[in-house]
Amino acid sequence: MASLIYRQLLTNSYTVNLSDEIQEIGSAKSQDVTINPGPFAQTGYAPVNWGAGETNDSTTVEPLLDGPYQPTTFNPPTSYWVLLAPTVEGVIIQGTNNTDRWLATILIEPNVQTTNRIYNLFGQQVTLSVENTSQTQWKFIDVSTTTPTGSYTQHGPLFSTPKLYAVMKFSGRIYTYNGTTPNATTGYYSATNYDTVNMTSFCDFYIIPRNQEEKCTEYINHGLPPIQNTRNVVPVSLSAREIVHTRAQVNEDIVVSKTSLWKEMQCNRDITIRFKFDRTIIKAGGLGYKWSEISFKPITYQYTYARDGEQITAHTTCSVNGVNNFSYNGGSLPTDFAISRYEVIKENSFVYIDYWDDSQAFRNMVYVRSLAANLNTVTCTGGSYTFALPLGHYPVMTGGTVSLHPAGVTLSTQFTDFVSLNSLRFRFRLTVGEPSFSITRTRVSRLYGLPAANPNNQREYYEISGRFSLISLVPSNDDYQTPIMNSVTVRQDLERQLGELRDEFNSLSQQIAISQLIDLALLPLDMFSMFSGIKSTIDAAKSMATNVMKRFKRSNLASSVSTLTDAMSDAASSISRSSSIRSIGSSASAWTEVSNSIADVSTTVDTVSTQTATIAKRLRLKEIATQTDGMNFDDISAAVLKTKIDKSVQITPNTLPEIVTEASEKFIPNRTYRVINNDEVFEAGMDGKFFAYRVDTFDEIPFDVQKFADLVTDSPVISAIIDLKTLKNLKDNYGISKQQAFDLLRSDPRVLREFINQNNPIIRNRIENLIMQCRL
């Protein structure tokens, strides 16, 4: 049947997950982008498909194993292990604080009998008696003295198979390793002025942070990772660790990449944002004691300011979102003061400020990436507004404070009668503060937020300072300007197309023949047959189907199906067979995720209504999972979608994914589902209505939630194509047999077609009503 298309989409939409993840990982790892002119070298249009480009990240990741570095003399940072990797015997490292500690480490090859060897320690020839009785392991020994000319003593030998050694300055001590691998441990020597100890390494070395000491010990005992033991790892100078600090100018343009026709420019600018709120105050009719509305409204503000000696003319438009509606009613008399609705912005609200100026930065702001901004916080405090009553003392709304905190910036387009301007939309989240607001001579006091009555508090404007940065694709020739006709972004283009397509789709409902619709609803539509009405479908079928699946997998239906199996198993296992009110609540919760059991019998009806409304939303998924021979709402929905796709002249492969996804969520919103038990029918609707009745008389009977939940778990779920109201009307006016009633209850397509072919006005009217519900 036609609903097969939705099941195909639900099944196949998850097959694109892996390729999507690979693409996302690849784009997230991209660090820079070179613009290749490609086919655009011969045309006047810029590319509109953009990759992720450079992804800047302020997080500093410290490497686990930093190196190898060439032998050198340096002052190692404290709390860092210097991991030494010598290749020959002899002195491998030495260091001193030039006061009371001269310390060196010597490496001795395996199988060395006691012998005297001469070592060069701190510029002097020193003779030491050394030995290594191990036949296979190398031996590290520490030798130290307290004076430059004193005799050296030997300490803490380390017998090592990997031939690695490490030393660290930390907490007034110099730490080393001793023992025998693979069980070597750390030891230490006390030293004054330990942080000033300079060390000279005579072999390649690595640097490991102290918080990775466990990893350092693993290397000492078991050796370096295999990748460090290849000939491709070449030691570099320690100076490679030095960071060259370059301070970016606040206002500058940097060429990121350049080709023959296009170049990427990074634009850094400081910015001064001035804005103000506006509001609408409407008095209600009557004697003058009541106000209908006090609300925020957008307002544009124009101003000038200096930026690096340049005079900038700027425009800002301030609007709010997520307002909170308050009201006050002083009584029921015509002379009682009342406000039907006044708006307040609080923590759950957002303030949007669209900014545009006449500088060069905004003239080529068409193809933009890496947009970022840093702005200050601003506090907005409300003033007073007096409600002038005909008689009596005037109530005054006063106070209220919110702070605006930057929460992001996006590129937007402002349209005027003559031009479309690319602008920056700054989003601000809010926090409330003192003072609170109140209405004098009323009970309204100590409320927090900023009311719309007087949000500017006699100020001409609020001001925010900061800076923004973006990378824009512009013509390489500075004399050219990116055409403003291209300033509408790809997404805005798509939204405009979708808007036109929605209007066309909705107007096509009148042109659908019901008999053809029923025939189409019974066909097993697949991906290709569904989209065959689009031009060039054969060429674009594969990529178009993939795009539909990608978009569809983010739909509400696909998200719900991902939890369908768990929900069904939970429902089947947790439904109790007890008939108590408490067990009814628990059994319903298996479907509705209602965790609270019902204790008050008086609220049972309301609770059942809530439960059945939520159950009805899941019955669609149950019906999709267990298809019956009857026609369902998704068959009609898919058939209407197919018909409108074939008739449409606006649809394109770009708009198809959006339309299919939107249709799956919005077509036929008023759905009712039923389950049949012998001669009893149980129905539950999306609107929370529920009822049960007998098939032969259509007389209602008490609705047993326990029984309904059991039936839903074990029995097929059927779309109520012909609802109870239509059935009663049909029985009263035409008379139908019990078997016909059963067939209509099961949405038997053969019986439906018979009634439609007979031009039965009641059935036709019901189907036409369903078609009219298929709107976007």
From Swiss-Prot:
The record marks R231, N232, R241, E242, R247, A248 as: Cleavage. A motif (KID motif) lies at residues 644-646. Residues 65-224 are annotated as: Spike head. GO terms for cellular component: host cell endoplasmic reticulum-Golgi intermediate compartment; host cell plasma membrane; host cell rough endoplasmic reticulum; host cytoskeleton; membrane; viral outer capsid. Disulfide bonds join C203-C216, C318-C380. GO terms for biological process: permeabilization of host organelle membrane involved in viral entry into host cell; virion attachment to host cell. It comes from the Viruses. Residues 510-776 are annotated as: Spike foot. Residues 248-479 are annotated as: Spike body and stalk (antigen domain). Residues 308-310 are annotated as: DGE motif. Belongs to the rotavirus VP4 family. In group A rotaviruses, VP4 defines the P serotype. Some rotavirus strains are neuraminidase-sensitive and require sialic acid to attach to the cell surface. Some rotavirus strains are integrin-dependent. Some rotavirus strains depend on ganglioside for their entry into the host cell. Hsp70 also seems to be involved in the entry of some strains. This is Outer capsid protein VP4. It comes from Rotavirus A (strain RVA/Pig/United States/OSU/1977/G5P9[7]).
